[in-house]
Structure formats: C-alpha cells, structure tokens
A protein has these predicted regions:
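Cofactor-/ligand-binding subdomain signature composed of acidic, glycine-rich
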Residues: 2-55, 77
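Cofactor-binding active-site loop characterized by glycine-rich and histidine/acidic residues
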Residues: 43-46, 51-183, 201-207, 212, ...
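Short gly/pro/ser/thr-enriched loop/turn and capping motifs at secondary-structure boundaries
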Residues: 89, 195-198, 259-261
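Active-site glycine- and acidic-residue-rich loops that bind
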Residues: 167-171, 230-235
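A glycine-rich helix N-cap at a beta->alpha junction
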Residues: 185-189
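Short beta-alpha connecting loops at secondary-structure transitions
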Residues: 195-200, 220-225, 270-278
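Structural signature of the thiamine diphosphate
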Residues: 232-268
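Conserved small/polar residues in nucleotide/adenosyl-binding loops
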Residues: 279-286
Length: 287
C-alpha cells in the first residue's frame, strides 16, 4: 500500500503552490494499484451489501481514492491516521489486510474488531490507524488529542485527521482548531470535500464554502487541492506534513473531490442528476 513545506497563515490555492515534488514511475504505479484495489474493494462491498451479507451502515469511498493514497504517500512510518465513517480505503492505505477489513464488514470473528465493529468501527494499533468513527466530527477532537500525545512524547510524528465538508460545520472542530494552534500540535486536518453532506450541498450548508479558510482566525494555514489528482494531493500533503512535523503547528488541506455513489448504501442520491457525475473513468485520474 501507499507508504511511506512550510506555508504562511494565509490560505492559498494549489495552483499557487511551490515547486512540485519529484514523483517516480514506480510511485505512480504503486498509487494506481492502491487506488484500483480500493475501487474494487468498495465495489465488492456494495455488491455484498446488496446480497444482505453486510449489515448496518456502509459508506463507500468510490471516487475519492486519490485523496487517501496521495496523503498516505507523504506520511512516515509511525504517523497516525484517524477518520470518520467512510473509512474502508483509509484502512487499506495504511496497509491493513483487505481480508481482515472485509471480514469485519461481514461480521466475522477474523475482522479487525472481531466482527463487532462493522463498517464504521475498525482499528489497528500496529498500523497506527485509530478509526473509523460513527459520530460526525468526533474524530477531529480525537486526532487533535493524538497529536498532543505526539508532541508530549517528542517523537516527531504527525497525525493525519480526516473529516468531511459536513463535519466541518461541527462545533468541536473549531474547539480542536483553537487548541491545536494554541499548542502548535503536529496535526494535518484533511477536509474531504466531496460536495455533499448526506444530501445537502456545501453551498446550502456553509456560509464560507472555501473550507480551507476555516482556520484563518486561529492562524492555521490552509490550502485547496484538486482531490481527483493524486500527484497534486501528494505534493500538497508533503508540504502540510513538513509544516506540522517541523513544529509549526496544524495545517488544513481541503481536498476538492467527488463521491460517485450515495452518502451510504441506503441513499439513492436523487438530489443530483446524471450530469453532475463529471468523472466517469474506472479509476481516479493521476494526471
């Protein structure tokens, strides 16, 4: 799986970014394989859900694969990852066994939570993956706490904390921003802006739709990134991770991406038309 720069407090777009990181052909091939695995895994999960072999909630990551693959490529061994309920691809990116993840989805004892956690609640201490959380936005405070632990231990590690555009409106997110900057914690906040919080578009839910600017009042730098371009994600993530690891505090990355499926398997996504599905290739583009 995907393995393993500083900025001012003013937000900026990816088009204004500094010199791009060199990416090798081997890296590109590895990223493509990772994204393809995630796509096929999610397609199979959707199929099994339809057959009644997966119970409860199931949120697919189809369309957003470039985000987690690009970010994971910028992390080092020992860096921590935490996310919300749309978490299958994040687990695969950290190197967790696809068989163990699928076993958990199907309620088997061989799953990462012994079949009791299901889709939204899996963890792996070995891979430094801390969930998988069903409460919207709860992982942001927890990720901030993980970063506090890293700073306290002086271990040089960073916590990649993922959340969505809907969770970006939760109050605890701003409490976390405040504490993270107050103590200059080594955390990178990754907002996966897939355009819809369940069935509500960003424009209908947020007065400030440029979500990377949300940390400006706290002095947290932010950047908007093309989340459909794995190389752009990797480039921005390297800068953000370097910023956090060097002791400069938190950084916000807004990944502009798109989910091809509904919010969950129970969502027919009737709130958008077929024309809204702009990206139709079998795997996210790595332009």
């Amino acid at each position: 799986m995907a393995t393993k720069r500083s900025s001012s407090a003013a937000s900026k777009s990816s088009s204004a970014r500094t010199k791009k990181s060199e990416v090798t052909q081997d890296q590109l091939m590895s990223w493509y394989k990772d994204m393809l695995l995630m796509r096929r895994f999610e397609e199979k999960a959707g199929q099994l859900y339809g057959m009644g072999l997966i119970a409860g909630f199931c949120h697919l990551y189809i369309g957003q694969e470039a985000v987690v693959v690009g970010v994971q490529g910028a992390l080092e061994e020992g860096d921590q990852v935490i996310t919300g309920y749309r978490d299958h691809a994040h687990m695969l990116a950290t190197g967790m066994d696809p068989n163990g993840v699928m076993a958990e989805l199907t309620g088997r004892e061989g799953g990462y939570s012994k079949g009791k956690g299901g889709s939204m609640h899996m963890f792996s201490r070995d891979k430094q993956f801390f969930g998988g959380h069903g409460i919207v936005g709860a992982q942001v405070a927890l990720g901030t706490g993980l970063a506090f632990s890293d700073k306290y231990k002086k271990n040089g590690k960073v916590c990649a904390t993922y959340f969505g555009d809907g969770a970006a409106n939760q109050g605890q997110v701003y409490e976390s921003f405040n504490m993270a900057k107050l103590w200059d914690l080594p955390v990178v906040y990754i907002i996966e802006n897939n355009q819809y919080a369940m069935g509500t578009s960003v424009a209908r839910a947020s007065s400030e739709t440029h979500l990377h600017k949300r940390g400006a009042s706290f002095g947290i730098p932010g950047e908007e990134v093309d989340g459909m371009d794995v190389t752009a994600v990797y480039d921005a993530a390297q800068r953000a991770v370097e910023h956090a690891r060097s002791g400069k505090g938190p950084f916000i990355l807004e990944m502009k991406t798109y989910r091809y499926r509904g919010h969950s398997m129970s969502d027919p996504a009737k709130y958008r038309t077929r024309d809204c599905l702009l990206y139709t290739s079998p795997s996210p583009r790595d332009r």
